[in-house]
Every structure is written in C-alpha cells, then in structure tokens.
Amino acid sequence: MDALVAHCSARLLQQEKEIKFLTAEVDRLKNYSCSEASADLEKLREENLKLKYRLNILRKSLQAERNKPTKTMININSCLEEVFGCAIKAAYPVLENPPLIVTPSQQPKFGDYQCNSAMGICQMLKTKEQKVNPREIAENIVKHLPDNEYIEKVEIAGPGFINIHLRKGFVSQQLTNLLVNGVKIPSIGENKKVIVDFSSPNIAKEMHVGHLRSTIIGESMCRLFEFAGYNVLRLNHVGDWGTQFGMLIAHLQDKFPDYLTVSPPIGDLQAFYKESKKRFDTEEEFKKRAYQCVVLLQSKNPDIIKAWKLICDVSRQEFNKIYEALDISLIERGESFYQDRMHDIVKEFEDRGFVQVDDGRKIVFVPGCSVPLTIVKSDGGYTYDTSDLAAIKQRLFEEKADMIIYVVDNGQSLHFQTVFGAAQMIGWYDPAVTRVSHAGFGVVLGEDKKKFKTRSGETVRLIDLLEEGLKRSMDKLKEKERDKVLTTEELKAAQTSVAYGCIKYADLSHNRLNDYIFSFDKMLDDRGNTAAYLLYAFTRIRSIARLANIDEEMLRKAAHETEIILDHEKEWKLGRCILRFPEVLQKILDDLLLHTLCDYIYELATTFTEFYDSCYCVEKDRQSGEVLKVNMWRMLLCEAVAAVMAKGFDILGIKPVQRM
C-alpha cells in the first residue's frame, strides 16, 4: 500500500506541475484564442481532483492499517519522518528531494523529537530566488501535517525548529504491545542474505588479543542481523593454506614418522610452529623439503593431505575452546576452500584484459587504487589477493549474498578497497544493489598506550586473557561478599557472566574505528558505562518484582489489563527511552557501529535509576517491611526495561544472570 500511495503522490505532483504550466499558458494567451489550452487545463483539473480523492482514501486506509495493534516495536523516528515527509511534499510540491531531518530531542523543553528541515528547504528556495524565512516554512509544514496517531502537538521554536510532542496514549499503547508480544522489531531482512567474515585466525598459530576484536564485533553484528530477520552466514576465513604448511608438514614427518598410522601427540602447536620455523630459517636441506611438501600439498598428495588435516584439527580444537567460552558460532571456510577456483579467477581477469605482467608477476590495477593486486606470483603461486577475489565471487554468485561484511582490522582497509574495486570493475556486483563493506577496527592497546603485550614483550594469548578475566571476576565478587549469599552454581554463573561480559562490553562500547586501551580495572568497575554496572543494574531490576512477591504470571496478566500511566516526568522519560530501541538498532544496521547500542543500554539503565529513585513501584511499611501497595503500571515499566536490556545484552553476546 505504501508503494501505491507513493505512485499516486508522484502522479499528483506531475499533474500539479502541468497545471501550473498550462495556467501560465492561459495567462499568456489571454488576448488570443486559447480554447484548446483551456480544454486541456479543465481535463487535467478534473483528473487531478479524482486523483486527490483516491489518494485521500488510500492514506486513510493506510493509517487504519497502521492503527491496528502490531506485534513488533515500531521505529517512531521513521514514522515521524513519514508524516513530515508527506507534509513537506504537500507544502512544497515542486521541490525535488527536499531535506527530511527528524531526530530525538536532546532536551525535554524541545519536545520529544524535532524536525529541522525548514532551514534546508529555505536554502533550496533561495536558489530558486524565492524570498522566505525558515520560520514561515516551518509554519507551512505544520499546516500541511496529515492526521496521525503519534503527535499530540507541535511547536515552532527559534528560526524554524519544529518541536514534536508525542501522544501519551500512543506511547502507553506501544509499551503495552512490547510487554504483551515481547521485544521484536519488524523483519526488515526477510529473504535477504548477509555473510559476515570474522575472527579468521591462522592455523598452527594461537589466537591472540588481536583476534579478540574481530571475533567479538563479528559475533555481535551477526546477532543483530539475525534479530532483524536476515539469513546470516557466519564465516571463519582461517589461514589454512600456503607455504608455512610445507615446513609444518616436513617437521611433522621428522618428529612423528608414523603419523599416518598413529595420531601424533603434537600438544603445544605454537611451540611446534616455532621449532619448524627455526629449522626453515637455518637448515637449507629442511627448507628444500618444506618447499617440496608445499608442491605435494597443492597437488593433493593423500599422505600430505592427511598431515595437513592433522595440523588443522589440532588448531581447530584450540580455537573451539575460545569460541565455546565466548559463545561464538562460526562456520569454518578457510583459504583452502577457494584453491580450486583460483585458476578460473586469473583466467577471467586475463580474458577481460585486466592483467599486466610485471617481473613475472600477474598484476591487476584498479581505478582509484594506488597499489595493484598480485593475482599470480613470479613463481606461479597464488596470493591472498587471489583467494580474496575467489572468496568474494563465490559469496556473490554461489551464496547469492545481498550483503557481505568483512570484520578485519583497519590495516587491511586499502587491501579490501582494492579487492572490492576489482570485483566491481569486472562486473561481479553493483554497489547500488549489493552492499559489500569492510567493517574495520583499531588495535588493542595496553595501559601504556602501546600495543598490548606481555611483560616479556610477547603478544598476549587470548586463552590467558580469558583466564585472567575469570580470576579477577571472582576476586571482585568475593570482595563484595557475593560468595556468602550465592550458591556455588550461582557464584560460578556470575563469575563467567561478569568476566566475559566485561571483556566483550569493554570492546563493543568503544567506537570500533578507534584503538582502545585494555584495562581489567576499568572494565570490572561497577560504576559508569561498564558491563559490571549494567549487569548489577539488570539483576536489581529483575529482583524488584520478586521481592514484592509478584510472579511472571501476575505480570503477564497485568500487561493485558493494566494501562501504563506516564504522568510523572520520570515515567514519561523512561517510557520514551524504552521505545527508542528499534531506531537505535536501525542506525547500527546502517553504520555497523555497535558502541551506539552500548550507549543506549547505559542511558536506559541510568534513566531507570532516575525513575526508580523518584517513583515508588512498591510501597512498604517502614517498620515491618510488609508490602502495602504495588503500583502495577510501574512494575510493568520495570519489566519493559528488563526485557529491552536483556535483548540488548543478547545482541552484544553478554549473558546476564538473575542473581549476582
């Protein structure tokens, strides 16, 4: 129906332009015979009236559809944009693509939302030599506002800002819908496929702190896309191919000659890698054998393939320990997966005339990129460039992805810019149709603001970092004497929740584009914008109903029967904050910056604290502690906050606990 309204509106606009033109023609021909022009004009006017009538019916029908109870939360900002978009179109039908700016107000005195389009429209009209001030434009927009269920009143402030006040009944109804139906947003990703490429460690090397960001950010993005209804393919593009496997396999043959029949106890793969690397750098004979093993691997020699699989399996077991601890879900599809596609990729670029030869290398220059891609080395081998081109083509043509997101550090931005440019140049995708993005991120720094290292100067192993987090988390809980009030199981759950939650949140709450300083002390602080504070706030909210002897069934019944009153300013502020959740998520789907969600959850928690300190949810006898009165509509507000926080935590990959 939206499309039909848009189509009618466009036709109406075109007709109004034609009427203007013909009216001018009639005026010009006043002194001459103009019966033909007049006849055309009358015909257009008649059709125009019919269209206006039809459009009015369609708009009313669309509004009636919208007024039906919905099972999902609505994006209020988008709804207001639609309303003001209609008003601007009606007020200024001749303007093409006028600015449409609706945002939440920063201060209560400016209403709940603001429309700041008048200033931009004023600039557009000035270019058409029309003298008008922004305030007059704002008044004209307000005059053309269609009937809607959202707006109580509007006020024009300053030079032309339109302050929007929402209807309390509308906000109350939306909160009731949330409580009755759960925290859901419209399925905007229905029938769309997203591929997220993240984590991607190298086989035979341990995961280190550098892999933490890609793993955490990528997982959270996947959860958000899934919540928005997308079909998500989570890919782990591991480094499981290349010359390093030659030296690893040659070393395996020497150290465990019976590896084909007896499973070799490799144990510490990192040490195994270092041993083979040392031999590769110092023993010429070993180096030759290593290169022979690479050739045999590429030709799929069965014995060499078995050795390769053994090494990959040992690595995979270590990776999976970390993925399991952090609740990360991935499908492994490493560089080896794309090996058989490399030859065809090179041929396709050659056939299209994009390949140049430079010192025996086959290179591809991409417009706007300073460094070419090397798709074949001088020794005839393929490169990361070749495998990344093979990967992007497979994802576009075989997986039929509508969107591909690469969660890889900022250092790779030029590489991905060139790969994406090459894929567009050869015609694999159109960026106007398919979104292919590099979601880059900064490095993890120590408290000295240098790259995060151990005291001996080595890269911090991720498994060690997680174990240290668990230790510090338990110390913090014992410091607060939680071990005296929680059962052993509850204490263990709280320890894991705080440790991993704090590590994830510390990363996600920073703008991913920037470097961030890793500090256990800061992330475990239960004050400020930290997971520790938010997890404590969540358990506190969850405990309010429990301590008032209100069970889930009573809350469910109340959600259907109790009107949510929003008369107190703190109730109103909290209600509006809860309902901003869908617009926050929409922004992140657009820019992939997850710290916005962290900021929102923190704002929701602090807004709840203001509400709880000002509004009694449960009134008790001060002497006996007996519950005298329960303000059920406020209990429902508590429940709505907890529900939204729980979904926010879930998207961030954080597991809250009921007791802490």
UniProtKB/Swiss-Prot annotation:
Residues 529-543 are annotated as: Interaction with tRNA. GO terms for molecular function: arginine-tRNA ligase activity; ATP binding. SMART domains: Arg_tRNA_synt_N, DALR_1. A motif ('HIGH' region) lies at residues 201-212. It is an enzyme of class 6 (ligase). One of its GO terms (biological process) is arginyl-tRNA aminoacylation. It catalyses: tRNA(Arg) + L-arginine + ATP = L-arginyl-tRNA(Arg) + AMP + diphosphate. Keywords: Acetylation, Aminoacyl-tRNA synthetase, ATP-binding, Cytoplasm, Ligase, Nucleotide-binding, Protein biosynthesis. Pfam families: Arg_tRNA_synt_N, DALR_1, tRNA-synt_1d. It comes from the Eukaryota. Residues 1-72 are annotated as: Could be involved in the assembly of the multisynthetase complex. L-arginine binds at S200, P201, N202, H211, Y384, D388, Q412. CDD domains: ArgRS_core. PROSITE patterns: AA_TRNA_LIGASE_I. The modification N-acetylmethionine is found at M1. Belongs to the class-I aminoacyl-tRNA synthetase family. Forms part of a macromolecular complex that catalyzes the attachment of specific amino acids to cognate tRNAs during protein synthesis. Modulates the secretion of AIMP1 and may be involved in generation of the inflammatory cytokine EMAP2 from AIMP1. The alpha-helical N-terminus (residues 1-72) mediates interaction with AIMP1 and thereby contributes to the assembly of the multisynthetase complex. Interacts (via N-terminus) with AIMP1 (via N-terminus); this stimulates its catalytic activity. Interacts (via N-terminus) with LARS2 (via C-terminus). Monomer. Part of a multisubunit complex that groups tRNA ligases for Arg (RARS1), Asp (DARS1), Gln (QARS1), Ile (IARS1), Leu (LARS1), Lys (KARS1), Met (MARS1) the bifunctional ligase for Glu and Pro (EPRS1) and the auxiliary subunits AIMP1/p43, AIMP2/p38 and EEF1E1/p18. Interacts with QARS1. Part of a complex composed of RARS1, QARS1 and AIMP1. This is Arginine--tRNA ligase, cytoplasmic. It comes from Bos taurus (Bovine).
